[in-house]
Amino acid sequence: MNEQLDMLVLMRPAPIRRPILADGDVVQGEPHETLRLPHPRRAWPMACIELHQHDGGMWMWGVQHAGGGYKVGPKWGRFAYTRYDALYFAADELIERAHRSLSRIDTQFLSAAQLRQVIAWAKGLE
């Protein structure tokens, strides 16, 4: 089964990256979909992925965790052909960011255990 899933990943088109637009827009209202990993004690989530369909039918994503990240919008130039692909790329980016945070000494917003929880959550979304 894993070999079959790996083949599906190989067939996925690469994300579409456009230059960042300094004066570009982000979604001001609610994005089409928001996935959150709740924090056990705080009001804000440990991790959040926003997905939104752009005017041309392509999907955009935004990723937040450990007090940082960005809101979904065309400003960031991150696009995918399908919602499924956008979710995959967002989860992959979140995993990469959480691994970078784990490698730093000061994880002031999330503990190492919480960062590992973020990684496991994002892997479950892929």
Language-model features, listed with the residues they occupy:
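Negatively charged, low-complexity tracts enriched in Asp/Glu with abundant Ser/Thr
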Residues: 1-46, 111-126
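Intrinsic disorder/low-complexity signature
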Residues: 3, 61, 103-105
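Compositionally biased amphipathic helical and low-complexity segments enriched in hydrophobic
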Residues: 6, 36-38, 52, 88, ...
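Intrinsically disordered, low-complexity segments enriched in small/polar residues
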Residues: 22, 27, 54-55, 60, ...
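Amphipathic, interaction-prone secondary-structure segments
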Residues: 32-66
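A short, exposed loop/beta-hairpin motif centered on an aromatic-Gly-Thr core
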Residues: 64-96, 100-101
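Polybasic, proline/glycine-rich intrinsically disordered low-complexity segments
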Residues: 87-126
